[in-house]
């Protein structure tokens, strides 16, 4: 269930909404749950600008942290579900990077999506490619799976 509905958000070329609708603390959108706002303020107090989005069955917010795009998802009642962090390979931990490159020599990591949720270790969805192929790898703990393996051109 954690990965359900994430396909749209795992696209490497997806960018957050423009800064024109940024919301500062204390100016919560009227449709955003007070519970979600309280959780966000408690866990991301350092964030200065955030954009909120409301969907029929959930809400989420987007903010930037350096070269990372953070998306924090809440259910329709305002309870935190997971956080999706997208970033370039330069921000990937050395341990994860080595694990990938030791198993996929000749590939270059192109983009990372990290999914954090309560009671689970982070899940990494990593895009990588070589001259002929594109792969999407899923890493969770010691488990590594090829989720997509595509031929170029």
Predicted regions and their residues:
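Bacterial Sec-dependent N-terminal signal peptides
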Residues: 1-21
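Interaction-mediating elements
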Residues: 18-153
């Amino acid at each position: 269930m954690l990965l359900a509905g994430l396909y749209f958000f795992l696209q490497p070329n997806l960018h957050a909404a423009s800064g024109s609708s940024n919301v500062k603390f204390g100016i919560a959108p009227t449709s955003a749950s007070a519970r979600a706002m309280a959780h966000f303020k408690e866990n991301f107090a350092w964030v200065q600008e955030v954009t909120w989005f409301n969907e029929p069955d959930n809400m989420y917010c987007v903010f930037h942290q350096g070269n990372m795009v953070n998306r924090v998802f809440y259910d329709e009642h305002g309870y935190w579900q997971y956080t999706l962090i997208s970033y370039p390979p330069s921000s990937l931990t050395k341990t994860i990077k080595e694990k990938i490159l030791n198993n996929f020599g000749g590939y270059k990591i192109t983009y990372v999506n990290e999914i954090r949720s309560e009671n689970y270790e982070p899940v990494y969805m990593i895009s990588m490619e070589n001259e002929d192929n594109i792969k999407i790898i899923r890493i969770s703990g010691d488990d590594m799976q090829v989720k997509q393996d595509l031929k170029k051109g």
